[in-house]
Amino acid sequence: MTPTHFTISSAFLLGMMGLAFHRTHLLSALLCLEAMMLALFIALSLWSLQLDATGCSTAPMLMLAFSACEASAGLALLVATARTHGTDHMQALNLLQC
Amino acid sequence: MHPTTLMYTSSLLLMFAVLLYPLLVTFTSLPLNNDWASSHAKTAVKSAFLISLAPLSLFLSTGMEAVTSSWTWMVTTTLDITLSFKFDHYSIIFIPIALYVTWSILEFATWYMHSDPLMNRFFKYLLTFLVAMLILVSANNLFQLFIGWEGVGIMSFLLIGWWHGRADANTAALQAVLYNRVGDIGLILGMAWLATNVNSWDIQQMFILSKNLDMTLPLLGLILAATGKSAQFGLHPWLPAAMEGPTPVSALLHSSTMVVAGIFLLIRMSPLMENNQTALTLCLCLGALTTMFTATCALTQNDIKKIVAFSTSSQLGLMMVTIGLNQPQLAFLHICTHAFFKAMLFLCSGSVIHSLNDEQDIRKMGGLHHLAPFTSSCLTVGSLALTGTPFLAGFFSKDAIIEALNTSHVNAWALTLTLIATSFTAIYSLRVIFFVTMGTPRFLPLSPINENNPAVINPLKRLAWGSIFGGLLVMLNINLFKTPVLTMPAELKLAALAVSILGLLTALELATLTSKQFKVTPLRTPHHFSTSLGFVPAIIHRQIPQLSLLLGQKIASQMVDQTWLEKTGPKAIANATTPLASATSNMQQGLIKTYLTLFLMTLVLVTLISTT
């Protein structure tokens, strides 16, 4: 595995582990989500450079646009959670689970 | 212009002017004096009658007929309509008779409606009706006839509902309008067919241009129009219900003039029907059914006006039978003679009703032969004329019709029904006379029996002269268009007289049984059938609105609105998706951390396995 491949994969995995093992705050989960998106962005940008494939040059921009939408959706959910549950503690979201 | 035609046209113009002048006076804002009705309206009709005798005498002496076309009304590319009057055998003889009868009725109405505060309006309506009827009778094209047709229909509505505070009167007026409207559909169908296929509404042009065409459809339309206006079976309930109007209205409209308009239309259009066997058979069977059914209903009615109304309906059926025998002139003769005695019967009923303080039930009358002798005598004369007593007015037309019926190749069932109806005529006429004039009084002692007013006596006298001599006078002075069959077996010749005498004897026998209890448990079903008018109004007047309402509910509301536009459209998507969505959200328990951890671990495993 090349060092670049290893770096990006491990960055992605670390972000995902942060998303999966979050304990208290929803905001930290959203930050890890952003980290995953960042890793994917760098990967896509390096793709066209390393492989000399100019056809995929626009892919990182698209990726960035969609990640911005997703981040804003996540933040809206955070605000809604804060309004309905009072905090963004993860334990609060499970209270009415059946 | 030929002097005879000039005489005809100027007489009709003068008649219209004389009749319209009192009406125009009412349109100014001057208040009418109290005896406007007797001084203006009745005098106008009397003058119009005297004027109409001039064309009549000219026609009787020369036999000349005329058609006058004057003002061009509409010119379209294909159809011209002009103001056109036909002075033929039918209109010249009918107009004086109608005016004579109307004169008598108006004079009677000055006494009958004396206490009504709106008497002047009543006379105005009657005059308007008369003008519309004259337009109908003298019309030479179907457009003008239609104007008269609708005019008489509207005036009938206004006059039947004269006492509009009474719910039954309003119902009866509405029935008259609705049933006449159904008939009007037939007339408009006939007119439309003729306008599009024969390209004319003029009577002369229609007859010539339709020689080789198949006229079944327009003839069916015209027969439907006659069924509606002349109360044939199927569209008949309005005529007995129309007795809610005052007695002069019943006498004028619903015995002599308006209800014969349908028959008159068929008589005018008879050259179209001569060769169409379907139309003739339909007229015959419809007329026979009508005359039998209504005579049956008349047997057990207890309201004197209803009995006379059913009698009118039965005679109208007889006229329809005559048209079905291809004898329009005999039907016309019956119209003329029937006008006299039927109007007189209604006026006698009116006199009796007012004398007994507005009592109309014959079970509460009796003994009027001594108390109101003149009225009873006129009632008897009228009933005898109705049953076709030899040499009174009704005999000449009715006997001629029955003879023609017996000697032609005709449906035996129609023949039987007509003969039975003739015998029923004798039965219910005797019933009326028995209950009203014979026996002992069954009414309250202080009844205002007074027939000494000349406004009552003179009309009855005039109509009595007409009932006795009218048939003879008309028959002596006309030429029959079709040669009648003059030789027949004696049984056929005497058939009408025999069945009438048979009916009379049966009725006399039944009359003597009224004071004895003949049967311990009487047979009530036929009586119920007859008294409830064959259950036709009870069924039809409820069934048709119920069907319409059901149709509205089932189709408009339930099928279209609720089903197609709601349940299968927008709501279907919602109803299908909601269970799916709730099932899915019930499945997801919300344990995000567990789901993500599992996802991560599988991802790590995949990575490790793929790299090693």
Swiss-Prot record, chain A:
Pfam family, one: Oxidored_q2
Disulfide cysteine pairs (residue numbers): none
GO BP, sorted A to Z: ATP synthesis coupled electron transport
Record's catalysed reaction(s): a ubiquinone + NADH + 5 H(+)(in) = a ubiquinol + NAD(+) + 4 H(+)(out)
GO molecular function annotations of the record: NADH dehydrogenase (ubiquinone) activity
Membrane topology according to the record: Multi-pass membrane protein
Matching InterPro entries: NADH_UbQ_OxRdtase_chain4L/K (IPR001133), NUOK/Mnh_C1-like (IPR039428)
Keyword match Translocase: yes
Membrane-spanning residues: 1-21, 26-46, 59-79
Domain of life: Eukaryota
GO CC field: mitochondrial membrane; respiratory chain complex I
Main location: mitochondrion
Keyword line: Electron transport, Membrane, Mitochondrion, NAD, Respiratory chain, Translocase, Transmembrane, Transmembrane helix, Transport, Ubiquinone
Keyword Ribonucleoprotein listed: no
Compartment(s) of residence: Mitochondrion membrane
Function as written in the Swiss-Prot or TrEMBL entry: Core subunit of the mitochondrial membrane respiratory chain NADH dehydrogenase (Complex I) which catalyzes electron transfer from NADH through the respiratory chain, using ubiquinone as an electron acceptor. Part of the enzyme membrane arm which is embedded in the lipid bilayer and involved in proton translocation.
Family statement drawn from the similarity comment of this UniProt entry: Belongs to the complex I subunit 4L family.
Name under which the protein is recorded: NADH-ubiquinone oxidoreductase chain 4L
Origin species: Gadus morhua (Atlantic cod)
Gene assigned in the entry: MT-ND4L
